[in-house]
Amino acid sequence: MTATLALTEDLIRRRSVTPADEGCQAILETRLKALGFDCEALVSGPDDFRVTNLWAVRRGTQGKDGKLLVFAGHTDVVPTGPLEQWHSDPFAPTHRDGKLYGRGAADMKTSIAGFVVAVEEFVKAHPAHAGSIAFLITSDEEGPAHDGTIKVVEALSARGERLDYCVIGEPTSVDTLGDMVKNGRRGSLSGKLTVKGIQCHIAYPHLGRNPIHEAAPALAELAAEVWDQGNEYFPPTSWQMSNIHGGTGATNVIPGHVTIDFNFRFSTASTPEGLKARVHAILDRHQLEYALDWTLGGEPFLTPRGELSDALSSAIEAETGVKTELSTTGGTSDGRFIAKICPQVIEFGPPNASIHKIDEHVEVRFIEPLKNVYRGVLERLVA
């Protein structure tokens, strides 16, 4: 068994459902301290949702004047779902048909193990490496993410720590290892819209005001609106409704209000402020009586082609023969926080088809090549 596979299995055995870490970071800290890393635990969150974060750094011979390459990842995993639907215990790493099964196998314990072992090999080969290496690990990525990476970023920013490159171990590949990496992500802006009416008997509509009827034309206009055209890196901004709630449950009552949940996934071609203003303008034009609460989940970030993307693309092709695709598709990630203090952020990991699903898995044949790609990035950027 390879060192990467052994560490992956050890991490999968830990029932680290958000925000629990269940000792994963202690395992990493032990191995990193043995390599000369300075390790710092940053614990945050309320008593009923304590989040464990790890910042570990090994300075190169150039010290703080040299480049700093960070690996960012999360030890937490999503809940298993119905255990009876799994073909094996999700926290007992199981091999079947050339695949390693377990919760977190793809998202993202294999990536964490791969980068740790890559660093172990790299430091052995280059004990006097020039650039610096760091790990930023959290147990709150799959949850609300209020006390995870964002807290570490705030602490690093406050002390003036400069990050030059960041590789996030998210599972970005699609059909085969290395066919896609993420060099950016769209922003997320959510709204909870409550349109007010007047409740009354459904047989006497003239005595009330139906908020569903009043909201419908405005919602249709919002759904049809072209928010932007996107750009060379991002598709056009998308506006989608996720929930509509109105009524008392009775079939003979016009409701007093209706609540609509919606979400923007927006590109760098739009801003949160601009999108908000346009939504309010449409609602006001329809003369609705409404309240609207906004939540900014994250702003878009983009890493143009440069040193990090070139190093990663080159390492992928050297190891796998695959020419990777730079993409900004998909949901949000902790990259939205890290990009505030790091100019080059790229996500790369194993195929993602099984993430968050029953029988999550990673193909064993991809585990060592993943580690080798990570080592290739280290060789190219901080040796």
Curated annotation (Swiss-Prot):
Residues reported to bind Zn(2+) 2: D107, E142, H356
Xref: CDD domains: M20_DapE_proteobac
Molecular function GO terms recorded: acetylornithine deacetylase activity; cobalt ion binding; succinyl-diaminopimelate desuccinylase activity; zinc ion binding
InterPro entries: Bact_exopeptidase_dim_dom (IPR036264), DapE_proteobac (IPR005941), Peptidase_M20 (IPR002933), Peptidase_M20_dimer (IPR011650), Peptidase_M20A (IPR050072)
Active site residues per record: D76, E141 (proton acceptor)
Cofactor note: Binds 2 Zn(2+) or Co(2+) ions per subunit.
Residue numbers binding Zn(2+) 1: H74, D107, E170
GO biological process: diaminopimelate biosynthetic process; L-arginine biosynthetic process; lysine biosynthetic process via diaminopimelate
Entry-linked Gene3D superfamilies: Zn peptidases
Protein's job: Catalyzes the hydrolysis of N-succinyl-L,L-diaminopimelic acid (SDAP), forming succinate and LL-2,6-diaminopimelate (DAP), an intermediate involved in the bacterial biosynthesis of lysine and meso-diaminopimelic acid, an essential component of bacterial cell walls.
Family: Belongs to the peptidase M20A family. DapE subfamily.
The protein's name: Succinyl-diaminopimelate desuccinylase
